[in-house]
Amino acid sequence: MAIRVYKPTTPGRRNASVSDFSDLTRSTPEKSLIRKNSKTGGRNNYGRMTSRHRGGGHKRQYRLIDFRRWDKDGVPATVAQIEYDPNRSARIALLHYADGEKRYIIAPEGIKQGDRIETGANADIKPGNNLPLRNIPTGTVVHAIELRPLGGAKIARSAGAAVQLVAKDGAYAQLRMPSGEIRNVDARCRATVGEVGNSDHANIQLGKAGRARWMGKRPITRGESMNPVDHPHGGRTRGGKPPVSPWGKGEVRTRRPKKASNKMIVRRRPNGKNRK
């Protein structure tokens, strides 16, 4: 994928860039693999806001992505199309399996139309193939990794994401996450070889507020710039109080300090001046 940079013909075009979509081979999705995707505007079933800065945006159809490929062990597939997915930053690949079934997967870097894809413990180590971590050589870059066996891919699914298998220790495999954290994962968990494609997605500049609104993102306003009636930080007399949400809740870390999965973390991600 390449980035197309606009000339500054208008203020909205200045510094704006888009994908040229040259890596796509099809413009319409497979009808049997799309579902309705309703918007919530950041509200729950009571109509109360639970996630700020969300609302509006273009309508989307949800593409059913196969994150559990273990039921296709030993069934080869061919990459039929590389498609755009409005619901994620990565591209998706349409697979035609030898048994006649069609499925979408996250498109790895370097995959192209006509490639052969395999699933199972005996699959070759090549981009797009899915197999257990215990069958993957140390040092291999992988993505779409399960956290629990047969639980479906949870880690490294966005554009350009890559995780390195750094070691194997008994029943566990050690993975270096994109954040720099090293974590133990059950060696029976599945992973897909290669990194996620569309890595240039991070270099796209929206250029104007309107493009963010097309994506369903609403403006972010600081509490200090509001009036006291609208936010606890509003007005000129905040008085050094700790930061809170518009509803007065303290802005604290949301991860439980005694979370059971903490024992799976071998080395924490670097932070502050130690981050590379």
UniProtKB/Swiss-Prot annotation:
GO terms for molecular function: rRNA binding; structural constituent of ribosome; transferase activity. GO terms for cellular component: large ribosomal subunit. Coiled coil: none annotated. Keywords: Ribonucleoprotein, Ribosomal protein, RNA-binding, rRNA-binding. Residues 255-276 have a biased composition (Basic residues). The keyword Nucleotide-binding does not apply. The keyword Transferase does not apply. Disulfide bonds: none annotated. GO terms for biological process: cytoplasmic translation. One of the primary rRNA binding proteins. Required for association of the 30S and 50S subunits to form the 70S ribosome, for tRNA binding and peptide bond formation. It has been suggested to have peptidyltransferase activity; this is somewhat controversial. Makes several contacts with the 16S rRNA in the 70S ribosome. Part of the 50S ribosomal subunit. Forms a bridge to the 30S subunit in the 70S ribosome. NCBIfam families: rplB_bact. This is Large ribosomal subunit protein uL2. The gene is rplB.
